[in-house]
């Protein structure tokens, strides 16, 4: 069965792309009565607040019609930012060599939290160099993955 995030991504991809943006990813955080639906968008020339507002109106209209979430939630539309979350194998592959922070569902090498450089993406498997040790993580074991911004 598809997750809520994947169903929402399928539902919102076309409307976001119709406005000239890429749907980078979806994050749904349940926090009791105050759940949050985060929609991350990206564009060739970056994203500004007006872009977010336009996408928010379009996404809100689609969600009002489709009504995929039965509880109250707050809709947030933003760019992925410098510490961008990663959602797909293609996104991880685009950042080979970059440092990432991973939160895992099941421990790998005794830890559910890893920081290291992406060395390879092979299908649905991600290789990460953590303190000189090569670890392999299944993408479906990653609860949350973010680029570690370098300043």
From Swiss-Prot:
Localization of this protein: Cytoplasm
Keyword entries, A-Z: Cytoplasm, Ribosome biogenesis
One of the GO biological process terms: translation
Stored InterPro entries: Ribosome_maturation_RimP (IPR003728), RimP_C (IPR028998), RimP_C_sf (IPR036847), RimP_N (IPR028989), RimP_N_sf (IPR035956)
HAMAP family: RimP
Biological role stated in the UniProt entry: Required for maturation of 30S ribosomal subunits.
Family: Belongs to the RimP family.
PANTHER family: RIBOSOME MATURATION FACTOR RIMP (PTHR33867:SF1)
Protein name in UniProt: Ribosome maturation factor RimP
Species name: Shewanella oneidensis (strain ATCC 700550 / JCM 31522 / CIP 106686 / LMG 19005 / NCIMB 14063 / MR-1)
Source species taxonomy: Bacteria, Pseudomonadati, Pseudomonadota, Gammaproteobacteria, Alteromonadales
Name of the gene encoding the protein in the UniProt record: rimP
């Amino acid at each position: 069965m598809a997750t809520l995030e994947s169903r929402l991504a399928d539902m919102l991809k076309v409307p976001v792309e119709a406005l000239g943006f890429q749907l980078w990813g979806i994050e749904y955080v349940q926090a009791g009565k105050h759940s949050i639906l985060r929609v991350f968008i990206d564009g060739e020339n970056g994203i500004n607040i007006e872009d977010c507002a336009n996408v928010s109106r379009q996404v809100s209209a689609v969600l009002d019609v489709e009504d995929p979430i039965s509880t109250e939630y707050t809709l947030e539309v933003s760019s992925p930012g410098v510490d961008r979350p990663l959602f797909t194998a293609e996104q991880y592959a685009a950042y080979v060599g970059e440092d990432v922070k991973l939160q895992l569902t099941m421990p790998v090498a005794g830890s559910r939290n890893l920081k290291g450089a992406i060395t390879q993406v092979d299908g649905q498997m991600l290789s990460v160099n953590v303190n000189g040790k090569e670890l392999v993580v299944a993408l479906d074991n990653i609860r949350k993955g973010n680029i570690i911004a370098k300043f």
